[in-house]
């Protein structure tokens, strides 16, 4: 199994499909695809991959409840590449993601797996040139990874022809449906061939997701990770009661005086707070980057590049970053604000320990937040402990 994948106890997986495939060789994949899988670093399928790749290849609709770090991107990427007809130079697979960053990351994975195949993969995302999209869509791209707004626009303009689409994949469906994309996604469904296979992946199963499954999926295979396993293994969860909002900043600087951390991601709930915190930390000589949804795509790319290269030690973000960006060297995540949407908690703290490293998540809570934190514990069947005074030992 690749280092990037969290192992899951088999007893924590429920599936309505009884075949489990323990080896990529046993999936009877195209030779070129198999070479790409091993070249990418996958050794054996993760628990989700053992159960979901085959039914997707067989053309069944699949509903998989899986969070970041379980190998879900590999699951649908491998299945999509297996089913693509390389001779047909037209879009055959459509993958939707809630953010541009996640769409680009998925595109990178698909391209890496397809390195020995004759397959073109295009990212159809906001903030990029319409001309580029138009040329790629008319130039034989077979797998399109995109965000709902831009994909809908391209189909609506009749630039993206959907006649050959046979597979529609929705990644992070709970996030897409909760952030205003619902109407566009429903419209995209109506513009695809009625025979299209639907694969839906979601960390949680709120009503919006279940509504999509009942409206657009045909007798889907369901693969569900039990809710109490949705917190990623290896993440130590702690809280600090700062009592009042005004004491958060002092708590943060005290924390940095006590520990030695290579890099950290700090989450705030608003752009304004991201900007204020960034400014205060810079005044105190911290090397800080900030990222939020209003930034131009080019600016976001530059900021992420700086952070990944290590030239910035702290990345402050709104929930934009909480889904799908691999920041492998991060050992600490700080929720400066508890997330306003409890489904986002898992995505925020999942940043820390996804790649086999021990991760620490520290939540700053005011007296008013205690109830919300207890609700998070109930929702995820987990425990958030008070940060011990011997905090430096956590980072040894």
Curated annotation (Swiss-Prot):
Query: The motif Q motif: which residues?
Result: 22-50
- SMART domains xrefs: DEXDc, HELICc
Q: Provide the domain comment.
A: The Q motif is unique to and characteristic of the DEAD box family of RNA helicases and controls ATP binding and hydrolysis.
- The residue ranges of the Helicase ATP-binding domain are 53-223
In which organism is this protein found? Answer: Kluyveromyces lactis (strain ATCC 8585 / CBS 2359 / DSM 70799 / NBRC 1267 / NRRL Y-1140 / WM37)
Keyword Nucleotide-binding appears in the UniProt entry: yes
Q: What is the protein's major site of localization? A: cytoplasm
Return the EC number.
3.6.4.13
Q: What is this protein called?
A: ATP-dependent RNA helicase eIF4A
Q: How does it assemble?
A: Component of the eIF4F complex, which composition varies with external and internal environmental conditions. It is composed of at least eIF4A, eIF4E and eIF4G.
